[in-house]
Regions:
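Fold-independent oxyanion-binding glycine-rich loops
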Residues: 13-15, 43-44, 76-79, 119-122, ...
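Conserved catalytic-core segment of NTP-binding enzymes
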Residues: 120-205
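Generic beta-sheet signal
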Residues: 7-11, 113-118, 145
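Phosphate-binding/switch loop-helix module in NTP-utilizing enzymes
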Residues: 86-130, 135-138
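Generic secondary-structure signature for well-ordered alpha-helical cores
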Residues: 32-37, 65-72, 107-111, 165-172, ...
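Amphipathic, non-transmembrane alpha-helical secondary structure
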Residues: 25, 103, 107, 157-161, ...
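N-terminal phosphate/diphosphate-binding loop that engages ATP/GTP or pyrophosphate donors
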Residues: 3, 7-18, 22-101, 108
Length: 206
């Protein structure tokens, strides 16, 4: 990867369906107020649509449609995990080729951009079977992480701790945690105690 200058952040979650894509939509909207030229990449995608003979991750397609990012769609979605992807990988590993694909895609997405938002797939360990876990991809992209988890205190912080261990193992910094799907009448209560629990782990509640 040649681009180590363009600011970037990697959005991950403690589990699937925690609201990572919704969070990414909100963050991109906010970021564009300060950085008009924003790029987006979902390095590893599991659900995709066919666009001009390319398999494009659904979230990449959505972001481009909403924000008109002026990024090449195939580079926003460099690796599409089809049903036979893992089986083929385990038969004949081609990890260096996949890593290079991710790096080159990022460089193209980041070209003449002020900021790039990178979105992961599920929790930190997803993708480990083909050696491209979210933690490793964040490391490859030299990106710090914002972790999204569901509202609550006990279980979310337990899950954050598990994910934190995986990211730290790869030397990736978590810059903050977003609590999603919190009931309106519980926001103040959960925020107070979740913040205390996260601070004990050296993490910030955003």
């Amino acid at each position: 990867m040649k681009n180590i200058i363009t600011p970037r952040v990697f959005i991950a979650a403690t589990r699937q369906n925690d609201g990572k894509t919704t969070t990414s939509l909100g963050l991109l909207s906010a970021i564009k107020r300060y950085y008009p030229r924003v790029g987006y990449i979902k390095p590893v995608g599991q659900r995709f649509v066919d666009v001009e003979d390319h398999k494009i991750d659904e979230d990449s397609f959505l972001m481009d449609k909403v924000f008109r990012l002026n990024c090449p769609l195939p580079e926003m979605s460099p690796i599409a995990v089809a049903s036979d992807f893992t089986r083929k990988y385990l038969k004949s590993s081609n990890n260096p080729k996949l890593v290079k694909r991710v790096q080159q895609a990022f460089d193209r997405v980041a070209w003449e951009k002020d900021f790039v938002l990178c979105e992961g797939t599920g929790h930190a360990g997803v993708g480990s079977v083909f050696d491209l876990s979210n933690a490793r991809v964040a490391k490859i992209l030299n990106a710090k992480v914002i972790l999204v988890t569901q509202g609550g205190i006990g279980r979310p912080i337990d899950e954050v701790a598990l994910n934190q261990a995986l990211f730290e193992k790869d030397g990736v910094e978590i810059i903050g945690v977003i609590l999603n799907k919190v009931r309106q009448d519980k926001v103040d209560y959960i925020s107070e105690f979740a913040r205390k629990g996260l601070e004990r782990r050296g993490l910030n509640l955003l």
